[in-house]
Amino acid sequence: MNYQLLLENIYNEVKNLENTGKIADYIPELAKVNPDKFGISLVDSTGNIFEVGDAKETFSIQSISKVLTTAIIFAKEGNELWKRVGFEPSGNAFNSLIQLEYEKGIPRNPFLNAGSLVIADLMLDHFEKPKEYFLNFVRTLSENPNIQSNASVAQSELESGFRNAALVNFIKS
């Protein structure tokens, strides 16, 4: 299969669609991101890399990290993990307090903010330096030793994370 041609066809079909997404402007540092950046990268099973558009552009992975941290913790906890966080879908917003209250403080799944906060707590339990462990995990998985965390984005998240603080306090209660 000609993956490069396939990616180019997808890219050309999608790039001119109306941009209906929304930048996460509630996080000041992310509000600065150019919404017109668009790239696709694919690595096939033999390690060949195919790219189109802004695929070389660095970006903040944000909630993609939830998948990666969940994989790390599932490897440590196995099915015991599901006693702390569920694995059911949710029709509510990713940062909903209502869902958490309805579920009596047990997040519905690890991909909601409340669930990812439980996963972060488990990262603290399992690793002396969880941020360093996570970064090394991502570097190894991606075969890219240049991946870095972004201090400006982290600080921006911290300064605007009031809802996440509320979620943590609700879980603790």
Whereabouts are the PLM-identified features?
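N-terminal short leaders/motifs
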Residues: 1-2, 69
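Active-site-adjacent helix/loop patches that line small-molecule binding or acyl-intermediate pockets
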Residues: 2-14, 18-19, 75, 79, ...
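A short, well-structured edge-of-sheet supersecondary motif
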Residues: 15-52
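A short, structure-level motif marking secondary-structure boundaries and short turns
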Residues: 28, 54-55, 152-153
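Active-site SXXK
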Residues: 47, 61-82
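Glycine/charged-rich beta-loop-alpha catalytic/anionic-binding loops adjacent to active sites
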Residues: 48-56, 96-103
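Active-site nucleophile and cofactor-binding loops and adjacent substrate-binding regions
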Residues: 56-65, 110
